Amino acid sequence: MGKIVNLLKHSNSTIVNLRHFSGNALLVMTLFFSAIGCKNGIKNDLVKQAKPTIMVIPSDNLLKKNDALKKEIIDGADIYIRDYNCYLINDTKSKTAISIIQKAFIDAGYPLNDLDKNLKQLNDRSLRDEADGVKKDAKTLLLESVQPDIIIELDYSFDMDMNSRNFDREISYTLTAIDAYTNKVFSSNVYSGGKGQDFRTAFEDAIDDKIGTMMSEIDNYFGDIIENGREITVQFNIDRNSTIKLSDTYSSTGESYSEWIQDYMDYYTINGTYKLERNSDYEMHFVNVRIPTQKENGTQLNALGWARQCVKEMREKLKISSSNRAQGLSEVVITIK
């Protein structure tokens, strides 16, 4: 058995002389590698079976057509304010289309966040945020409160077919899959050519043409997240009233705060996956950061939880105070005071 352990330690050997092992040792070795293969197989199965939480929302184009998308200038920046309640009242067909898409995902086993049901809670929270002087639109509030994994944006048209003798309408739609955490578009499926007079019947027939392809693309994308971690951005900066610089040393070994941060990033990311984009005395900015989707105890881990743990470690090990000032699902902004 000792020879097997030594062999596993020296993995540079590509050829094994089986005559060096007894029959029992070969049996143990076979069982060992079979167990590894079984474990990897279970992991792969879990990745394949994992389903992201879905939320279906109307596109900005549909909101604009129904006067439910406004542009405001806040602190010199263009901010788009989305009114989903107004839109769903003005466009009843969209409510039908969303329910058909949702049913398809539910039937396929996906967890779902229902837009209509969450709007009441959203309105209550919006009132509280406005009382606090914080202006946020419906989409931002939805993502922060509901936290779906994937957003499906729907855009559609149901216009009269001028060439039809039966007064048919022609249906077309676009389904866009977006990572709710990074706002990255990873799938877009366009359909056109369906005809009919009843919207529900026409849309049910049309959705079957693309929904299977989109589900496969979603599964592949989410499988990568489960296996390789969720992508976020991480920024460390120094508060304007602080006397600390990231290049300052914090211990007798001469290690700087920036070196500690890089060591932390190496340890608390998936396979040390990140890119240091900016590095100065007052800021370190990391992109393409991959963090686990779960903690060691099996509970979910998001950017907020990751930042909370980092702030705690900095307080305990560096003896400095810091806070996470980020807004959004995929952003960490730790400010050192």
PLM features: residue spans?
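Bacterial Sec-dependent N-terminal signal peptides
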Residues: M1-L46
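C-terminal/domain-edge helix-coil "capping" segments
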Residues: K39-D67, K184-K275, W306, C310, ...
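Catalytic micro-motifs at enzyme active sites that drive phosphoryl/nucleotidyl and oxygen chemistry
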Residues: I42-N44, A138-L142, F158-N166
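Extracytoplasmic
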Residues: Q49-K51, T92, T96, S145-I151, ...
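Solvent-exposed coil/turn segments that connect beta secondary-structure elements
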Residues: S59-L62, N118, S157-D159, T176, ...
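Extracytoplasmic/secreted cell-surface and envelope-processing proteins
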Residues: K64-N66, L122-R125, D161-R165, I244
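N-terminal segment of the mature soluble domain
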Residues: K65-I151, E255-R315
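Amphipathic beta-strand/beta-sheet edge segments enriched in Tyr/Trp
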Residues: I150-G196, E331-K337
